[in-house]
C-alpha cells in the first residue's frame, strides 16, 4: 500500500514538471524572437505595451471563471500595490531588460536571469528578512558561496565577450559591422541594463510575496498588474519616440512575435509558473531556470543563426553552477528547519 501511494505521488508530480519545463523552453524562444524583433528597429516599450495588453486580454476570462467567487474587495491600497507590482515586475523591468537584450543576445539575457535567486537573497539580507546569524550555518555558507559563484559567472560573461565559436560563414549575416570599440561599449551597457532589469524583478518577487498574502487570487492579481503595466509601458515608450505611427506595425514577423510573447511568454507562462510553484515549490521553479538558457541558445544558434561567443558560454556555465550551489544550500536550510521543527514537536509531546 505504501509503495502504491509513493508511486501515485511520483506520477502526480510529472504534469507540473512537464508544464514548467515546457514553459521555460517557451521563454527561451520568446527571448530569442523578441531580440530578433528588436533588431528590426521596433521601440522596445511598444513591444512591452502590446505584450502586457495581450496578457491582460488572455487573463481576464481565466480570472473571471476561476476566481470570480473568491476575489477580495478591491481597495485603493490594493490598486496602488498592483500599480507598484506592474512597475517593478513588468514595465520598468521590461524597459531595462529589453533595452539590454537589444544590445546583447538572448543567451546572455537568460544567463543573467539565473542571478535572480542570488540577488533576491542579497536583498533579503539588506532588508533583514534573512537573518545574518543564519549565514554562520553550513547552509548559509553554501548559499553565500553559490551567490559569489553566480556573480563571478555574470561578471565574466559581461567583461569577456571572447571570440565567436560558431561557423563564421553560416553566421556571417548576424555579425555586427560596427567598429569593435563601439560593439564592446554596447555589450557592457547591455549587460548593465539587463542586471538592472533583473534587480527590479528580484525586488518585485519580494514585494509580490507581501501582496500575495493580502490578495491571494493569482490570476486576477496578474491581470491587474498586466493592465497597469500596459499603460506604464505606453508612457515609457515616449522616451524613445512620440510619433504615433510607430505604434502601427506592418511587419508580419514582428506582429507574430508580439502575439507569441503576449500569449505564451506572459499570460500562459505566468499561469504555468503559478500552478507549478503551488504544486512543486519555488525551489524547483528556480532549479529549472537554466532550461530557458539552453532553449534560447539553441534557438539563437540553430534557427536565428546568431553567433555564439566563448565568454557567453563560459559565463553562462559559471552562473548555472552558482545557481545550483545556491539551491543546494537552500535545500539544506529547509531540511534543517524541518528537523528543528520535528524535534520541537517531539519535545512538546513528551512534556504532555
Swiss-Prot record:
Localization: Membrane
Record GO terms (molecular function): transmembrane transporter activity
Record-linked InterPro entries: EamA_dom, WAT1-related
Entry membrane topology: Multi-pass membrane protein
Domain EamA, first and last residues per copy: 27-157, 192-335
Transmembrane segments: 14-34, 46-66, 83-103, 107-127, 139-159, 187-207, 219-239, 253-273, 283-303, 308-328
Family per similarity comment: Belongs to the drug/metabolite transporter (DMT) superfamily. Plant drug/metabolite exporter (P-DME) (TC 2.A.7.4) family.
Protein name: WAT1-related protein At1g11450
Amino acid at each position: 500500500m505504501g509503495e502504491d501511494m509513493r508511486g501515485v505521488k511520483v506520477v502526480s508530480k510529472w504534469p507540473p514538471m512537464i508544464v514548467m519545463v515546457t514553459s521555460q523552453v517557451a521563454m527561451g524562444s520568446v527571448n530569442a524572437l523578441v531580440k530578433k524583433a528588436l533588431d528590426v528597429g521596433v521601440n522596445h516599450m511598444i513591444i512591452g505595451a502590446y505584450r502586457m495588453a495581450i496578457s491582460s486580454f488572455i487573463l481576464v476570462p481565466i480570472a473571471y471563471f476561476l476566481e470570480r467567487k473568491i476575489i477580495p474587495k478591491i481597495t485603493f491600497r490594493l490598486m496602488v500595490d498592483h500599480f507598484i507590482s506592474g512597475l517593478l515586475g513588468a514595465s520598468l523591468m521590461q524597459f531595462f531588460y529589453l533595452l539590454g537584450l537589444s544590445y546583447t543576445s538572448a543567451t546572455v539575457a537568460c544567463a543573467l536571469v539565473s542571478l535572480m535567486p542570488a540577488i533576491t537573497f542579497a536583498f533579503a539580507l539588506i532588508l533583514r528578512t534573512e537573518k545574518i546569524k543564519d549565514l554562520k550555518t553550513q547552509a548559509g555558507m553554501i548559499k553565500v558561496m553559490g551567490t559569489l559563484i553566480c556573480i563571478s559567472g555574470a561578471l565574466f560573461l559581461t567583461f569577456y565577450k571572447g571570440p565567436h565559436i560558431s561557423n563564421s560563414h553560416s553566421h556571417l549575416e548576424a555579425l555586427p559591422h560596427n567598429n569593435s570599440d563601439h560593439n564592446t561599449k554596447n555589450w557592457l551597457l547591455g549587460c548593465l541594463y539587463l542586471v538592472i532589469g533583473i534587480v527590479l524583478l528580484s525586488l518585485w518577487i519580494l514585494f509580490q510575496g507581501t501582496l500575495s498574502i493580502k490578495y491571494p487570487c493569482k490570476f486576477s492579481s496578474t491581470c491587474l498588474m498586466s493592465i497597469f503595466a500596459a499603460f506604464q509601458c505606453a508612457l515609457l515608450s515616449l522616451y524613445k519616440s512620440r510619433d504615433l505611427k510607430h505604434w502601427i506595425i506592418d511587419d508580419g514577423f514582428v506582429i507574430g512575435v508580439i502575439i507569441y510573447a503576449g500569449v505564451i511568454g506572459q499570460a500562459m507562462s505566468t499561469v504555468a509558473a503559478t500552478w507549478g510553484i503551488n504544486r512543486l515549490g519555488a525551489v524547483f521553479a528556480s532549479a529549472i531556470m537554466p532550461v530557458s538558457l539552453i532553449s534560447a541558445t539553441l534557438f539563437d544558434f540553430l534557427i536565428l543563426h546568431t553567433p555564439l561567443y566563448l565568454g557567453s558560454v563560459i559565463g553562462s556555465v559559471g552562473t548555472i553552477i552558482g545557481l545550483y550551489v545556491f539551491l543546494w544550500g537552500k535545500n539544506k536550510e529547509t531540511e534543517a528547519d524541518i528537523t528543528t521543527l520535528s524535534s520541537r514537536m517531539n519535545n512538546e509531546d513528551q512534556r504532555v
